[in-house]
């Protein structure tokens, strides 16, 4: 293992192996402990995309909220559907919601807000690329979730895990923004392992991962965008050997996207020693 890989493995907290029951208990305890420590929290808010990550986090949150209520703490889980117009994988969103069984479902179509933002910028002489518009979608989705959380005395739960964190494969202040990120410390295959243990429909964790943010490249697989497979990323995070080419791609993503893992730099935090 290279020196940088050792540093990254320590930072990303991924275990080489997990026990599903123990890991789920630990994740629920983290969520419950955070709520118990903040008496103002009356709701937890999460956008549900129909993908592996939000399905797993949604199920964990609902399980945690159920236990909190049994312990006398009044709390609600609000699952949010955030389509941009007509969502191509809407059926999978519904399957995820059936599996999660959230207390409440809110649907907000982000298309009018995103399109108006893009148009307003265009009128100001700022013409966004399709990729940049994709980031607008991600930020609008998170803005909606924070608006709901503010209105309902809640917090926003994130879906960031270590296989995304290492590569920076999320939008800064978009899907990378949240109050808590329960599944940080898991890689992609471990998320699949937990969903299988929880009895999720296979298609929800065996489907090809995609952010699906670009109009010109609908359903673009994450692995195509990253230039490396999740299998390689997961192996790297577990301290296993990968090819020199895979190592270079992963470490370049890690270095280039360091700013996404930090809050705004100050004169005391930049440059780093």
Swiss-Prot record:
GO term, biological process aspect, one: NAD biosynthetic process
Record-listed deamido-NAD(+) binding positions: 139, 172, 179, 259-260
Positions of ATP binding: 47-54, 159, 188, 210
GO annotation, cellular component aspect: cytoplasm
Any one GO molecular-function label of the UniProt entry: NAD+ synthase activity
Top EC category: ligase
Pathway: Cofactor biosynthesis; NAD(+) biosynthesis; NAD(+) from deamido-NAD(+) (ammonia route): step 1/1
Short name of one Pfam family: NAD_synthase
Recorded superkingdom: Bacteria
CDD domains assigned to the protein according to its UniProt record, in alphabetical order: NAD_synthase
Tagged with keyword Metal-binding: yes
Known EC number: 6.3.1.5
Catalysed reaction equations from the record: deamido-NAD(+) + NH4(+) + ATP = AMP + diphosphate + NAD(+) + H(+)
Binding site for Mg(2+): 53, 164
UniProt keywords, alphabetically: ATP-binding, Ligase, Magnesium, Metal-binding, NAD, Nucleotide-binding
Function: Catalyzes the ATP-dependent amidation of deamido-NAD to form NAD. Uses ammonia as a nitrogen source.
Subunit text: Homodimer.
Stated family: Belongs to the NAD synthetase family.
Name listed for the protein in its UniProt record: NH(3)-dependent NAD(+) synthetase
């Amino acid at each position: 293992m290279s020196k940088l890989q050792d540093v990254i493995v320590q930072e990303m907290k991924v275990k080489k192996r997990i026990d599903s029951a123990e890991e789920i208990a630990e994740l629920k305890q983290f969520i419950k402990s955070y709520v118990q420590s903040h008496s103002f929290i009356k709701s937890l808010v999460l956008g549900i995309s129909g993908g592996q990550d939000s399905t797993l986090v949604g199920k964990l949150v609902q399980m945690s909220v159920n236990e909190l209520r049994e312990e006398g703490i009044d709390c609600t889980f609000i699952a949010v559907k955030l389509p941009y117009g007509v969502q191509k994988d809407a059926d999978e969103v519904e399957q995820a919601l059936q599996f999660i069984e959230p207390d409440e479902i809110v649907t907000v179509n982000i298309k009018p807000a995103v399109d108006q933002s893009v148009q307003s910028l265009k009128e100001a002489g700022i013409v966004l690329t399709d990729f940049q518009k994709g980031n607008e979608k991600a930020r609008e989705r998170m803005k909606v979730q924070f608006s709901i959380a503010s209105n309902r005395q809640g917090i926003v739960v994130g879906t960031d895990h270590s296989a995304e964190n290492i590569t920076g494969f999320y939008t800064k202040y978009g899907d990378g923004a949240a109050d808590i990120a329960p599944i940080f410390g898991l890689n992609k295959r471990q998320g699949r392992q937990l969903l299988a243990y929880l009895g999720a429909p296979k298609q929800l964790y065996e489907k090809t991962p995609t952010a699906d943010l670009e109009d010109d490249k609908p359903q673009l697989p994450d692995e195509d965008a990253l230039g490396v497979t999740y299998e390689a990323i997961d192996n790297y995070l577990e301290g296993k050997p990968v090819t020199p080419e895979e190592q270079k791609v992963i470490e370049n993503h890690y270095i280039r996207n360091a700013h996404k893992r930090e809050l705004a730099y100050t004169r005391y935090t930049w440059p780093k020693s």
